């Protein structure tokens, strides 16, 4: 697959629209092509992460209302499916309306919107989580700013499964070979010919070179978050 896009000249809105178009087109085949989050794999690690969040919330939560969780850029709804066991209020946020339609999660609120412009009031959520979210955004910092705005005092933002730039630099030859064998982009395009390779590449904005963990942590701190843990 070609990867010749001058991403430096791409506007944030172009990246958002590419995500919207591409995932609207492949929504029906998404889970068939990318089976990494299927029930055939043990995902109990997510429950441990959520339990750690709950322990943190117990010591910081203000008020007695029902705990609320937002799955930001929810995709297949993988994170929300695990979180619903622990959180009475679940919100799914995704820029693709068709992806949201594919998620079977009764009583969850579905919101079709850009994760960098979240239509929610201040102090609305206890936890905002994103699995493989940040690399789809041209500016993860804008998502962090929105998250800070809508999280309640003592709330938590959790992100995971975005490739780190130092990892890419350290293992570039091995990663190149792995991607040759297991690149989901080719499979998406083969299963959905009407989808666009350009949209796919734009949607994976930071997917090729990764994101800097220290830089993301610095941005979070500048916004006002306290960093509990950085693992990569």
What do these predicted regions represent?
Residues 70-117:
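Class I SAM-dependent methyltransferase SAM/SAH-binding core
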């Amino acid at each position: 697959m070609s990867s010749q896009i001058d991403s430096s000249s791409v506007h944030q809105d172009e990246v958002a629209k590419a995500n919207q178009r591409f995932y609207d087109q492949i929504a029906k085949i998404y889970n068939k092509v990318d089976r990494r989050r299927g029930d055939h794999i043990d995902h109990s690690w997510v429950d441990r992460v959520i339990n750690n969040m709950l322990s943190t919330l117990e010591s910081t939560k203000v008020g007695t209302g029902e705990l609320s969780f937002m799955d930001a850029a929810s995709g297949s709804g993988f994170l929300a499916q695990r979180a619903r066991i622990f959180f009475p209020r679940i919100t799914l946020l995704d820029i693709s309306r068709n992806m949201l339609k594919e998620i079977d999660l009764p009583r969850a609120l579905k919101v079709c919107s850009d994760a960098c412009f979240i239509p929610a009031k201040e102090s609305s959520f206890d936890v905002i989580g994103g699995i493989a979210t940040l690399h789809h955004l041209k500016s993860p910092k804008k998502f962090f700013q929105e998250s800070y705005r809508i999280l309640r005092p003592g709330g938590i933002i959790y992100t995971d499964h975005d490739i780190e730039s130092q990892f890419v630099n350290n293992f570039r030859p091995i990663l190149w070979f792995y991607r040759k064998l297991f690149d989901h982009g080719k499979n998406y395009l083969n299963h959905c010919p009407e989808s666009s390779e350009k949209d796919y590449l734009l949607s994976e904005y930071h997917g090729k070179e990764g994101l800097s963990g220290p830089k993301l942590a610095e941005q979070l701190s500048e916004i006002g978050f306290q960093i509990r843990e950085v693992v990569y």
